[in-house]
Regions:
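Generic alpha-helix detector with strongest preference for long hydrophobic helices that associate
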Residues: 12, 27-30, 49-53, 62-66, ...
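Short, well-ordered secondary-structure micro-motifs
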Residues: 41-42, 70-72, 107-110, 140-143
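Conserved C-terminal portion of the radical SAM core fold
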Residues: 56, 79-141, 155-172
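Glycine-rich tight-turn/loop motif centered on a GG-T
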Residues: 69-75, 145-152
Length: 173
């Protein structure tokens, strides 16, 4: 797993050609990607990659709220994610977006849910997954970056946040 979009388009096209030669019945290739790496690619480059066999890009949106994104040091903004997802769509690629329920903690829960739904509404991802935030490297380490005011959501709070998200979500399909 990794962000293949960090590689130059020329190299990605070479890799896709090798995959297609080795696996003649290959149906699709997918990749994770960060919005900031897609910013370095043109729609034309992404279209070339699609024509060479790349079909799905998995984008870890995590949040559509700039304050949450800043606090978790994502290195992305609402606008950088929006731009990347619209570029994916324009190139004819399929987008699969992941958001993290509970990422804003108690303090930023509502704005996280609403702004994330708004970003999804604007970009209309093909697939949308919600995951619950976890702390594989420890909650204390997460707090160091987020700030001491982070209080994780209770189970009830997680359900309320997803309800707020869904109430503001308006996907066309």
């Amino acid at each position: 797993d990794g962000d293949a979009m960090v590689l130059p388009t020329r190299r990605l096209l070479e890799i896709l050609a090798e995959l297609n030669a080795a696996f003649p019945d290959l149906q699709r290739v997918s990749s994770y990607c960060l919005p900031r790496n897609l910013a370095k690619k043109t729609v034309e480059e992404l279209t070339q990659l699609r024509e060479a066999g790349l079909k799905i890009l998995y984008v870890g949106m995590e949040s559509g709220d700039d304050e949450v994104l800043r606090r978790i040091n994502k290195g992305e903004t609402w606008e950088s994610t929006r731009s990347a997802l619209l570029k994916i769509r324009e190139a004819g690629l399929t987008s699969s977006v992941m958001v993290l329920n509970g990422l804003g903690g108690e303090t930023l829960s509502r704005q996280h849910a609403i702004n994330t739904a708004t970003l999804c509404n604007e970009t209309q991802p093909d697939y949308l997954s919600t995951l619950v935030v976890s702390f594989p490297q420890g909650e204390e380490r997460f707090r160091e970056g987020f700030g001491e005011d982070f209080a994780p959501l209770s189970q009830h709070g997680l359900f309320e946040e997803i309800q707020t998200f869904l109430e503001h979500l308006n996907l066309e399909r």
